[in-house]
Structures are given as structure tokens and as C-alpha cells.
């Protein structure tokens, strides 16, 4: 007697009893009944007639399943000499392997994720097994397809949908698309052109898997997702696929190919081709033009649910699996071009990536993941019952009882009560997705004015806040009849007509309305070719308002947005107002681009990330969410990470061409603002290059070796070239290497020994001053540490205080006379009296004079740290620390404010500025460093 199932009705208990008896009777007389198998078999019989049928047909399978942890079954070998047996072998294998999946699922050996993965692996195994046998058969009959370049061509089988995502349900069909890399002809006795060869091969593969025989079927095959659907060719070359997606590709196909994966045949070639398809699936910029197509798809889903009243369908019904998939994949399509983590085939990791990026809040993400797992588990059990491709909850009481008890619920109502909250939550989230547009509003007079342009006059612009309405009218009229506007499609022109009055209304309410309008028009002119940005402003009124606000307050950001519209994406990023990335996060964001093999593409991606991160820092500074001194430090960290990444790119290229110098080392030293962690927006980088290598090593070890010194010079030159190279996102940084030994007359790269000798014997005092702020920013750790030692040896030298102060004053006087742009009404924040350079010279003099006694001073490079260090050693009085910090912060803030609004760092000497400069000057005087008065003083 089998052990009864708790709560089972008498009829169900009898059904289970008969099922167990049927399996027992199917065993050969000499086959033992596995010990302890009766109870697990009864539980499985409750959940699946399919498993009972399979065990009745393959009774030897029971011993395999009765193991404590039944392993995968051996894959059948399809004998080329017996093709008539292939179908039966595949079907018996698929039935046995599927029975194992049910067994493990029902007995709790696998969770739903493992069951879905197992069903996927089974489908792939059958595909690969069948294709391998057919390829051998075709090769015998027709030979292999040979392309013009002599390469052998193989069929590529792409799996779409849940097969591609690795989430195949138990009794699912498989969505396949066939392709092949290149055209050609087979080389056998009965040759075929590649197109016919692979079409026949693909059709036979589908038939071998799909046809129902006395042994059932292996897998239902659906080929309708191929280009042109059922009317299209069975197999296309990669070139044909490319042409189709360039000319015919539609939004729903982007959605379908999001999960695509090469699952059989020439998998490597398939995955490589999918990389080329990525720009079709994921647009490079935030893709709000896709929203209309996605809304249409959502409306079709909603209409189908309403029309067919699919309340019991847990896949297509309200709150079902399809709604979760659509929710995740829609957000992936919109943002996946910018966020690599969203280019995920599997649904659950995609949901987590959306949570990590702030596109879904964590509770919602968890609720959707829980609902997805619950629904997929129920779906699998519905299909496991009789191996039927069903998604509908059963209507009959016996089936309901079996499903509920099999899932661990006492009765059907208990299962429904557990299911309902999941579906309700999913339906609510689906309803919110792609909600109807709420457009930005503007007075009707502005809408009428815009529609009338270029006709009409400036009258509607009078008295609404513009300082020069006539000039504004002329700008708007010129824009309205510009070639860019005239070239817009009807849809894009409709969007512009919706957006333009709202932009105009936002501009006139800005702090600088005329400047805001001028900058808005400049940005629109630059972005009209990319209608996705018009769609962004049309779809996101908050982004429109935010954009105009930023444009009105920052000429620099207005310029950058117009030059690099991808930065508009940052305005919509929910992380924009959150904590800024720390040093480690900045480093990770940059070095991740090294995963891109092509240097040009890696450089472009690196520059786009640098632009986005510096834009984020600029917004935080502009909004007052971060202190300017902290922003300059972050900009230096970002530059440091970029230099480290570029060095690796340069080294990668050089090693590939010439090998490496055995035992050699290279380091990049950051001077000036980079070294002092006080970099501005748009600052150049002061760099010095050092190298070292064993004396016995004379050259690199590649096929085209270079003399060691030349190799390092080539590396330094390549770093400079990459940092200054023009990409689609501009250049990374301008580089200044004049602080190297002997300046412009010296070698681009110095050996460690020559650098040490230069600093010891020939460097001027001002060069030692510069060394105070210098630090290693990239390169080999041992050489970076050796530089630290040279810096220590140089700066801890005992100096004559009087001579030191005289040298510092003379150099400051020279710089003042050559560089100070102050006049009677304005102060040069950097070079003026009491400005930032005076403060730097004060601190550098302190370090040079005190480091011999207090070497701990050398741990500091940044101005705030240097102030604290000099107070600590009592060179600066303790009471000067707070005033100096405040003065420094005031001057840095004023300087960044000028830079953000594209003004020279010449400011009217307001009381805060005047006080800051007086503090610096007074403390310098107290240290016998009375610097020459500034111009206009």
C-alpha cells in the first residue's frame, strides 16, 4: 500500500493507488522494487500523470529516480546508420529527462529556478543532439557549405523567448530562428547553395523534434519569429539578417530579440553576430521613441485580456507572467543602451538590475520577483500534470485538488488565496507602466505664437519677463524656419509643437530668461536629428523643467549638453540626486571599459562615462548638494581613474605590437591640480612620466622589439595620444608635460635614476614647490613607491629659510607680473593678491622649510590637508586653520561658479572674497612671505 497523501479525497487516494500499482506492474518480474520509493512515487503520481505514463513505458527509469539525488540522464547517441531510430531515441530521452525534472521539483530537490533552467538545458541538449546527427547526414549527402573565403559554414540556431532567457517552462514550445554566417555552396556530390542547404537542414531539425509519433514529441518548434515571419526564408545569412533589421526591424522584434541566444550549431558565430545586433535592440541613448510602440504592445495585451476574459490564465491573464515580462523588458529596452547591466536575458537578474539602478524600488522588485516565481511554479505544475501546453487554472474539481495538494495547500481555495495577492500586485504595476502622457503645460498664447512662426511679431513676448523680446522673437523665428526643423518627420514635428511652448514658458520663468532661451534653442538645434530627445522632453515634463533650470544657471553645462546630448540621460537618472560615486566607484566605472577589446570603442565608452560622471558632479555643485572643495577632489579622482584606464589601454596596444620590457616599470606622476586633488571642470592635467628597468634588459621581448628607453617613450606618447584623441564624446583631457625635468627641452619620459639626479642637482626651488603637490596617479606599484622615496629625499632636504623665502617670493612676483589679470574693479581668483596661488605658495614654503624636521608633512598633497599638517607641526598658528580653510573654500567656490557659467575667474571683490584674500595675505605676511601686491591693488 502506498502512503496516503494528507487531505486527499477518497477518489484521489484511489487514483494514486492505481498509479503506483501500474508502475509496479510495469516492472519486469526480475526487477526489484526500489526500497523506500513508494511514498515519493505517490507524491509524484499526485502531481503528474505524465510521469506515471513515462514510468509505465520505461520502467527501468524508476531505479534511477529512486536515488536520493537523481543525477542527469546520459544523452543518447544518434547512430548515423539508423536515422529511423532518431525520433524515438530523442522522444524517450526527453520523456525520461522530463520525468526526472518533475520528480525533483515535486519532492523539493529543486526550486523553481532550477526547474526552469533544467527544462532549458534539456531543450538545448535535444537540439544539439538532433542537429549534430543531421549535420553528419547532410555532410555525407551534400558535403559541407564552403564560403568564398574557404571557411566552413554551419547552421546557427538562435533561441528566443524563454529558451533564450534560460527560463523554459515544462511543456513549452521553443522559438527558433535559423541563420548562417556567409553564403556559399556545399562541396559534396550533390551540392546545394547555402540558402537551400540550411533551409532543408533547419526544416528537418524542426520535424525531428516536433512531429508527434507513437513515442510522443521531443519539443514543439515555432519558427514564426524569423524575419518576415511565416512568409520569410527558413534560414538567412548574417548579411541578410543585417539588411532585414536595418530596413524592416520593428519595435516588437526588438522586444523579441532582447532574450535571443545562440543555442545550437555554430554558437560562437551566433553570439558574435548578436553583439552586432545589440544597437538594434538597445539604442545608444535613452530610447523614449520606443514608448509609443511599447504602449501599442501594452494596449494589445490589455485588449486581449479583456476580449478573451482570461481570468484563469496565469500567463496571459491580468496579473500574469506576461505582464511581469513586459514590465521588465520595456524598461530594459528604454535604458539598456546606456546601462550594460540591463542587457540581461534572464528576467529575475533583469529585475534586480532595475532595482540596483533605481528604476524599480526594492519592495516592488521583490514583489515582482516573488510573483514571478510563484506563477512560474504554478504554471509548471499545470503542465506537468499531463505534459500539456496549458496556462489555465483547471475547472474540474479532481484537477484542482491535485494541483493544490501537490503545491502544498490543503485545498483549492487556499491556493487561490495565495495566488490572488501576487496577481493583484502585478496587475497594479502593469497598469502604472507607460501611463498616459502628462505633458508640460504652457499658456495658450505661447502655443499660438509658436505655431504662427515664422509669421507674426514679438507682441506675445512683451511683458512676460524677457529683457530683449525682439531679439528673442528673431531667435525663435530663425529656429522655426531652420533646416533642422523643416527636415523633421510629421511625428517629430508634432512632438516639437507640443514641447516648444512648454520650453518657452519654462525659459521665461528662469533666473536668466534670455540666456535660458538662447541655450534651449542651441540645445534643440544640436539634438533635432535625434528625435529620441524630443520624445524624452515630451514624455518627461519634470525633465523639461529640470533641463531649463540647469541651462539657465550654467553656460558650461548648456554647452556640454548641446555638444554631447547623451548627457540628457543623466537628468532622468534617479541616482542624479543621490550620493555621488566615491573614489572606488569612479575607478570601477572607468576600468570596466577595459572589457571592450577595440581600443577606439573602449576610449569612446570611457569618455562617455567621464562626461556623465563629471556632469553629475557639476549638477551636485550647482545645486549646492556638495561642497565645491569636495567636487574638485572628486574631479581629480575621476581624472586619476581615467589616466589609470588609458595607461592600461596604451600598454595593451604596445605589448601587442612590440612585447614588453622584462622587469620594466612605468609610472605617471600627477602634478598641479591633479596632484593636489583640486581639479576644476575642464582643467588640463599636468603629467610627468617615469620608467625603470633592469640594466641587463636592453629591449622589449616582442616580435618587433624596441630599445627599452624607446619602448617607454612610445608608451608615454601613446598615453598622451589616447587622452587627447577625439572620440564621439570629445577628448578626455588636455595634457601639459612642461613640468618634467628640463621642461620643454627635456625628454618626454625620464628614468627613475635621471629624475632623482635632476631633483637633487639641477631642479629650481619652484620645481621643488611643484613637487609638494605631486603624487603618483597610475603605474606599477614598485615604481610609484620609488617616486615617493625620491620625493621624500628631495623635500626633506635642509634649506636656508631666508634663501627659501626669497626664491618663493621671486617666483611669485614673476608669476604675478605675467599671469595676474586683476584690474581696478575685479580680482583674479587664482593669480590675484591673496588668491589661490598665494595660498599654494604659502603652504609649499612651509613644507619645504619644515619637512626636514617633520617628514610627516609629505603625506599631504591637497590644500586642506596641507593646512592641517602645517598647523600640526606648529608652523602655522592653530588659530589660523579655520580662517585659512574658509578662505580656501570661498575662493574655490567662486572659481567653480565662474567656470560653471563660462566666465573668466575674474570677480568683483565682494566682502567674502575680499575677506578671504586678506586672510591669506595676512598669514603669508606673518610667515615673512609678503607677496607682491596684485594689479589694481
Curated annotation (Swiss-Prot):
Keywords (A to Z) from UniProt: ATP-binding, Magnesium, Multifunctional enzyme, Nucleotide-binding, Nucleotidyltransferase, Transferase
A single Gene Ontology CC term: cytosol
Cofactor(s) needed for function: Mg(2+)
Family: Belongs to the GlnE family.
GO terms assigned for molecular function: [glutamate-ammonia-ligase] adenylyltransferase activity; [glutamine synthetase]-adenylyl-L-tyrosine phosphorylase activity; ATP binding; magnesium ion binding
Signal peptide, first to last residue: none
Top EC group: transferase
EC number of this enzyme: 2.7.7.89, 2.7.7.42
Region of interest (Adenylyl transferase), ranges: 443-937
Region (Adenylyl removase), start-end ranges: 1-436
GO biological process: regulation of glutamine family amino acid metabolic process
Catalysed reactions, as listed in the record: [glutamine synthetase]-O(4)-(5'-adenylyl)-L-tyrosine + phosphate = [glutamine synthetase]-L-tyrosine + ADP; [glutamine synthetase]-L-tyrosine + ATP = [glutamine synthetase]-O(4)-(5'-adenylyl)-L-tyrosine + diphosphate
InterPro entries per UniProt: GlnE, GlnE_rpt_dom, NT_sf, PII_UdlTrfase/GS_AdlTrfase
Record protein name field: Bifunctional glutamine synthetase adenylyltransferase/adenylyl-removing enzyme
The organism's place on the tree of life at top rank: Bacteria
Stored CDD domains: NT_GlnE_GlnD_like
Gene: glnE
Function, in words: Involved in the regulation of glutamine synthetase GlnA, a key enzyme in the process to assimilate ammonia. When cellular nitrogen levels are high, the C-terminal adenylyl transferase (AT) inactivates GlnA by covalent transfer of an adenylyl group from ATP to specific tyrosine residue of GlnA, thus reducing its activity. Conversely, when nitrogen levels are low, the N-terminal adenylyl removase (AR) activates GlnA by removing the adenylyl group by phosphorolysis, increasing its activity.
